[in-house]
């Protein structure tokens, strides 16, 4: 590979990492500000959890559109549209804040989610088609770039929310999305193989080797979405930690995801994705049980942050690489769309249920509910098909 080609690939990975970061940042703004938003809008945890569930469901459903759309019009164009319109949608949050309306907040969040939903299946399809060597490692680097940017988001969001109003935190990241959209399109060429007939959702569901992965992915989504929304508030209400330190704890969890993404990608290329997924599933279970059961709460929180941060994020490049390996190139967008729908869409149901359990029985009950799905994911990880996809990278 020439230096020019290598430099171009590095720029492409950096841009994808930035896009990945902003895509996730839009949805980690609310958790550290949740108490402030609920108080400002006058709603309960069940209501805010219900709104988050609807937005997350659309975030998942939109992936069913984003994947095939990327196969048809090009991943680069699809990602540009995603960034531009999800960024513009954040400005509606200012209206929600002024009107103190949960309904306007819901409109803003669902529009953000709908446009942002195009990103994940499209980006993973683009990576699997553009980078032919060490796909899992590249997936990991893409994740590292995304997580690095997201790491500071909870604290930045908290700072802006407390000092200027929670809506301005959304607007800042929306502006960054718009600026990145303006520079994204020209840095990616048309992917080879676009003339092939693109796959459909039905075609994706016919790939029998993917069914075990799909069910495993649903279990992951059912604990992930609840933890993502309620972890900072859990620390505030059940562990007596103030909002600033709860935001810092959430930031640290994301920070441990940076080495997690890199480790997961490297390990999947070396030993195969199945072993990585079993190990990371066990790590997630250890983290949640430590948070709930260790009598010294601060120790439990530290164990949770380290183990969950590394384990959860390490599973992503391994799972994404294996999914791409088992999928025909012309169907990868559709396949990734199905996978992100099951993870983010179906998984979003846990946000409403966890919010209801927290209101009715307390946050411990909600987190035991989420832990049950982590244990199910661990059991299912042993059923994932073995594959030699890592040999392609050696």
Model-identified regions with their sequence ranges:
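Residue-level signature of mid-helix packing/kink "hotspots" within the transmembrane helices
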Residues: 28, 56-64, 150-151, 254-262, ...
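Extracytoplasmic gate region of multi-pass secondary transporters
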Residues: 30-31, 209-258
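Cytoplasmic membrane-interface "Motif A"-like loop-to-helix N-cap segments
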Residues: 72-83, 270-281
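C-terminal ends and interior cores of transmembrane alpha-helices
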Residues: 84-99, 283-296
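Cytoplasmic helix-loop-helix junction between adjacent transmembrane helices
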Residues: 108-146
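Helix-loop-helix hairpin linking two adjacent transmembrane segments in secondary transporters
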Residues: 133, 142-188
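C-terminal transmembrane helical hairpin of 12-TM major facilitator-type secondary transporters
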Residues: 273-322
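A late C-terminal transmembrane helix in Major Facilitator Superfamily
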Residues: 324-360
């Amino acid at each position: 590979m020439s230096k020019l080609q290598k430099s171009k690939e590095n720029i492409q990975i950096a841009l994808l990492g930035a896009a990945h970061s902003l895509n996730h940042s839009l949805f980690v703004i609310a958790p550290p500000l949740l108490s402030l938003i609920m108080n400002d809008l006058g709603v309960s945890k069940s209501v805010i959890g219900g709104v988050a569930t609807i937005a997350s469901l659309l975030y998942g459903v939109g992936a069913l559109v984003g994947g095939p759309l990327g196969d048809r019009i090009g991943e680069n164009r699809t990602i540009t549209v995603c960034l531009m319109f999800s960024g513009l949608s954040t400005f509606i949050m200012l209206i929600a804040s002024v009107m103190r309306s949960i309904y306007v907040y819901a409109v803003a969040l669902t529009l953000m989610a709908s446009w942002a939903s195009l990103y994940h299946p499209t980006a993973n399809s683009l990576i699997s088609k553009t980078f032919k060597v060490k796909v899992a490692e590249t997936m990991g680097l893409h994740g590292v770039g995304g997580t690095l940017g997201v790491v500071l988001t909870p604290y930045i969001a908290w700072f802006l929310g407390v000092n200027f109003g929670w809506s301005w935190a959304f607007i800042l990241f929306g502006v960054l999305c718009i600026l990145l959209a303006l520079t994204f399109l020209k840095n990616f060429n048309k992917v080879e193989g676009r003339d092939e007939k693109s796959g459909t959702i039905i075609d994706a569901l016919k790939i029998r080797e993917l069914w075990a992965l799909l069910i495993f992915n649903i279990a992951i989504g059912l604990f992930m979405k609840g933890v993502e929304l309620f972890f900072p508030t859990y620390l505030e209400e059940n562990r007596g930690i103030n909002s600033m330190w709860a935001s810092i704890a959430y930031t640290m969890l994301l920070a441990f995801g940076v080495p997690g993404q890199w480790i997961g990608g490297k390990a999947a290329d070396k030993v195969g994705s199945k072993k990585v997924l079993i190990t990371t599933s066990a790590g997630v279970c250890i983290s949640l049980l430590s948070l709930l059961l260790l009598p010294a709460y601060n120790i439990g929180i530290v164990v949770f942050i380290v183990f969950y941060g590394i384990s959860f994020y390490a599973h992503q490049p391994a799972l994404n690489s294996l999914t791409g390996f088992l999928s025909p190139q012309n169907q990868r967008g559709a396949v990734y769309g199905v996978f992100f729908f099951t993870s983010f869409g179906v998984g979003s149901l846990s946000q409403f249920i966890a919010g209801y359990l927290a209101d009715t029985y307390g946050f411990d009950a909600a987190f035991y509910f989420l832990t049950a799905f982590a244990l199910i994911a661990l059991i299912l990880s042993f059923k994932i098909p073995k594959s030699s996809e890592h040999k392609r990278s050696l």
